[in-house]
Swiss-Prot record:
This is GTPase Obg. Monomer. GO terms for biological process: ribosome biogenesis. InterPro entries: G_OBG, GTP-bd, GTP-bd_Obg/CgtA, GTP1_OBG_dom, GTP1_OBG_dom_sf, OBG_GTPase, P-loop_NTPase, Small_GTP-bd. Residues 159-334 form the OBG-type G domain. The gene is obg. It comes from Chlamydia muridarum (strain MoPn / Nigg). GTP binds at residues 165-172, 190-194, 215-218, 285-288, 315-317.
Length: 335
C-alpha cells in the first residue's frame, strides 16, 4: 500500500527522578548525601533514508514514544538515559506541526537527521543540593517531562523522471518497458491508483547509477481543483527533474492528442506555475496503431500547435522509439 501522508503524535521520554540517599559505610557514620541524578529521557529524531518510498510501515501507528530515563540510585549513581527513537522517512518528506501548519523541516538528502522532540532532563539527587551550609540536604527533584508534538508527514517523491498523462494514455505499459518491471495495466481509467517507482538503467552503462522513474496516476481535466485523483498526486510532480508527458496519438482511446496535451500542460501550470521551468519531453505513444504516414501527419500538427515542445514517437507496447527516449534521458538528465 502506498501511503504518502500520515499524522503522528511523538512523545519524548520523561527524565528519571533524582533520589535522596545517604552514604553508609562502617567508618563514615556521617557520610552525607549520596543520591544520584535521574537519567535523561530519550528524544525522538527523524532521519531521511534512501530505498524507502512511502510511509506504509507507519500506516497503523497513532503515536511513537522514546524511552524514559531511569531514576538515580544510591552511591551517587546516575540513572540510565532513555533510548532515543529514530523515525526513518523517505527522501522528499515534509515535516509539519499538525496544530499550526508550520513547516519544521524538508528532508531532501539521505542521512539528514533532526531532533523533533527533546527528552526530559533527569531530576537532581540530593548530592546536587549539598552546600557548605547545608551538609545533609533532603531534597531531590523529579525528572522533567519529554516534549510531545503532533506532526504531519507528507511525501513529495524525488525522482529523475515523472510520467504524466491522461488515464489510458499507455503510461503503465511504457513504464513497464522502460523499467523492465510489471505494474498493473488495464483498458480502464485509473489503473494506476498510486505512484509506482522503477529504475531505468542507462543503456550501455552497466555501472552508472540508474534513473529513478515515477509513474504518476492519470490526470484528468480539473485535477488542479482536486477532481479525479487530483491534488493527492500532483504534488509528486514537483520534485521530478524531467517530466515525460505520455499522450495517446492513435486516436483510439482519446480523439484529440492536441487537446489532451493542452489540458495536461494547463492543469500542471494551474497547480503550480513554476512547473513551466521544468525540463519536459512529449512522448507520443501507441504509434503501433498508426501507419507511418499517419504518424508523421499527426506529429507535424502537434509541432505546429506546440512549437516550443520536444516530441518523440514511440510505442510502449512494442518498444519502438524507446532507444531514442533513452538517449533523450541521458542528454536531459546530465544537464
Amino acid at each position: 500500500m502506498f501511503v504518502d501522508q500520515i499524522t503522528l503524535e511523538l512523545r519524548a521520554g520523561k527524565g528519571g527522578n533524582g533520589v535522596v540517599a545517604w552514604r553508609k559505610e562502617k567508618y563514615l557514620p556521617k557520610g552525607g548525601p549520596y543520591g544520584g541524578n535521574g537519567g535523561n529521557g530519550g528524544s525522538i529524531l527523524i532521519e531521511a533514508v534512501t530505498n524507502m518510498y512511502s510511509f506504509e510501515e507507519y500506516r497503523n501507528l497513532r503515536f511513537l514514544k522514546a524511552g524514559d530515563g531511569q531514576a538515580g540510585a544510591s552511591n551517587n549513581r546516575t540513572g540510565k538515559n532513555g533510548k532515543d527513537f529514530v523515525l526513518k522517512v523517505p527522501e522528499g518528506t515534509l515535516l509539519r506541526d499538525a496544530e499550526t501548519g508550520e513547516l519544521i523541516h524538508d528532508f531532501t538528502k539521505d542521512g539528514e537527521r533532526i531532533v523533533v522532540c527533546q527528552g526530559g532532563r533527569g531530576g537532581k539527587g540530593n548530592v546536587f543540593f549539598k552546600t557548605s551550609t547545608n551538609r545533609a540536604p533532603t531534597k531531590a527533584t523529579p525528572g522533567k517531562p519529554g516534549e510531545i508534538r503532533l506532526v504531519e508527514l507528507e511525501l513529495k517523491l524525488i525522482a529523475d523522471i515523472g510520467l504524466v498523462g491522461f488515464p489510458n494514455a499507455g503510461k503503465s505499459t511504457l513504464f513497464n518497458t522502460l523499467a523492465r518491471t510489471e505494474v498493473k495495466v488495464g483498458a480502464y481509467p485509473f489503473t494506476t491508483l498510486h505512484p509506482s517507482l522503477g529504475l531505468v538503467h542507462q543503456e550501455g552503462y552497466l555501472y552508472q547509477k540508474p534513473w529513478i522513474m515515477a509513474d504518476i496516476p492519470g490526470i484528468i481535466e480539473g485535477a488542479s481543483q482536486n477532481r479525479g485523483l487530483g491534488l493527492d498526486f500532483l504534488r509528486h510532480i514537483e520534485r521530478t527533474r524531467l517530466l515525460l508527458f505520455v499522450v495517446d496519438i492513435s486516436g483510439i482511446e482519446r480523439s484529440s492528442p492536441e487537446k489532451d496535451l493542452q489540458i495536461l500542460i494547463g492543469e500542471l501550470l494551474a497547480y503550480k506555475e513554476d512547473l513551466k521551468n521544468k525540463s519536459m519531453v512529449i512522448a507520443l505513444n501507441k504509434i503501433d496503431q498508426l501507419l507511418p504516414d499517419e504518424r508523421e501527419e499527426r506529429l507535424a500538427l502537434l509541432k505546429q500547435q506546440f512549437p516550443d515542445q520536444e516530441f518523440i514517437l514511440l510505442s510502449g507496447l512494442t518498444g519502438e522509439g524507446v532507444d531514442v527516449l533513452h538517449d533523450l534521458f541521458k542528454s536531459k538528465l546530465s544537464e
